[in-house]
């Protein structure tokens, strides 16, 4: 099995894609999907199976990856506290302004944990936005690829700005490698691999 990307422990995926080889006698992919779902753990569900070219690679052929990080100011419950991050208050206007600083090509040397390729730390963020959906606030990032824990460190910095512990100017300095100011990633439970685009 070849996955489109790896995630940190406790990070979720609603749009993970993988490719594999199945025997030729499997022509009914709906039946195969049902059989697999009956035997997989309840935390994993296959949504769709489709035939692709023999040279398709779910990781290397991906053009864009979309991640979302969910926060709420509402009290969490035992049923949802593993799937969303609770914070006390949200300055929506400030976060909408701050998140735009990530758009573009940057060297994310100061936005990754060990385990990433230390030599190849440049990444392009195509889009970054912050918005509210019902009782949930969403950080939404679209990029070609990411370094290990990059998004959690980005969100961690944004939440520190929200709490007035950091500033947008501090964020600019770290993005431009002038200072390594902030090193604390947001907790994993609010992060989702949402979509892979080919």
Predicted regions, residues:
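Structured-RNA-binding interfaces characteristic of tRNA pseudouridine synthases
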Residues: 1-198
């Amino acid at each position: 099995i070849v996955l489109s990307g790896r995630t940190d422990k406790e990070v979720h995926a609603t749009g993970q894609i993988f490719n594999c080889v199945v025997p030729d006698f499997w022509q009914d992919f709906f039946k195969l999907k049902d059989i697999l779902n009956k035997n997989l753990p309840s935390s994993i569900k296959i949504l769709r199976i489709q035939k692709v070219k023999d040279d398709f690679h779910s990781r290397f052929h991906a053009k864009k990856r979309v991640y979302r990080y969910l926060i709420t100011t509402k009290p969490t419950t035992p049923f949802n506290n593993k799937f969303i991050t609770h914070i006390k208050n949200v300055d929506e206007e400030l976060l909408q302004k701050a998140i735009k600083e990530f758009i573009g090509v940057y060297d994310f040397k100061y936005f990754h944990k060990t385990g990433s390729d230390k030599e190849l730390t440049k990444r392009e963020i195509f889009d970054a936005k912050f918005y509210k959906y019902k009782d949930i606030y969403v950080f939404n990032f679209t990029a070609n690829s990411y370094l290990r824990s990059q998004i959690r460190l980005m969100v961690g910095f944004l939440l520190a700005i929200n709490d007035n512990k950091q500033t947008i100017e501090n964020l600019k300095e770290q993005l431009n490698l002038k200072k390594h100011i902030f090193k604390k990633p947001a907790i994993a439970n609010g992060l989702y691999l949402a979509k892979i685009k080919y």
